Amino acid sequence: MSEIKLNYHKTHFLTSAPNIRSIPEDTGIEIAFAGRSNAGKSTALNALTNQKNLARTSKTPGRTQLINLFEVEPNCKLVDLPGYGYAAVPEQMKIQWQKSLGEYLQKRECLAGLVVLMDIRHPLKDLDQQMIEWAVSANLPVLLLLTKADKLSQSARSKQVKMVREAILPFQGDIQVEAFSAQNKIGIDKLAVKLDFWFSPLFAE
C-alpha cells in the first residue's frame, strides 16, 4: 500500500446529524473522534486541521449533542461524536445515546478507526473504557490521545503515557497511546500519520 499524506488543512464541514440513524450513507472511510465532554475533542480537531473554528468548542460541556461530519477528501470523513459523561445531560438521554454509540461503533461498515481523547490527568474513566471495549470487540483500531499534555512536566507526561499503555494491555486490541497538546503542538503529526494510515486503503492502486 503506497504511503499517502492527506492535507487536513483542507478539511471542511459536511453536515450535522441529531442521531446515529441520521448520518449519511455508509460509504468511503470514516474515522470517529470520541471523548468526555471536557477532553478537548473540538480543540484537537481544530489543531489537526489548522482551523480555529472548524469544530465549535463549547464553553458548556455536554452542549455538543449533534454528530458533526467533516470531509478531508471525497470519501474521507472525520466524525465528531457528542461528548459523553456530562452530568447535566438527563439520565435517559445518556442511556439512549450510549446504546446507539455502541451500535455505531460495532455496525458501521465504513468506520476504519476510533480516536478517543482523554485528559492526560484523568485518563481511562468508565466511559472511556467502555468506548475502547466496544471498538476492540468490533476489531476497530484505536488511537488514545492524552490531551492537555502541556499541563504536565515532560517526566510526568511520560509517566502517564507509560501507565496508560500498561493499563490497556488487558483489552488486547490494536491500541496506540500518545500524548497530545493543541497548544504546544504535541502529537499533531502522530495523529495525522495514523489518520493517513487508516484512510490509505481508499488510495491503494
From Swiss-Prot:
Residues 27-201 form the EngB-type G domain. The gene is engB. Its cofactor is Mg(2+). This is Probable GTP-binding protein EngB. GTP binds at residues 35-42, 62-66, 80-83, 147-150, 180-182. Necessary for normal cell division and for the maintenance of normal septation. GO terms for biological process: division septum assembly. It holds the Pfam family MMR_HSR1. The keyword Nucleotide-binding applies. GO terms for cellular component: cytosol.
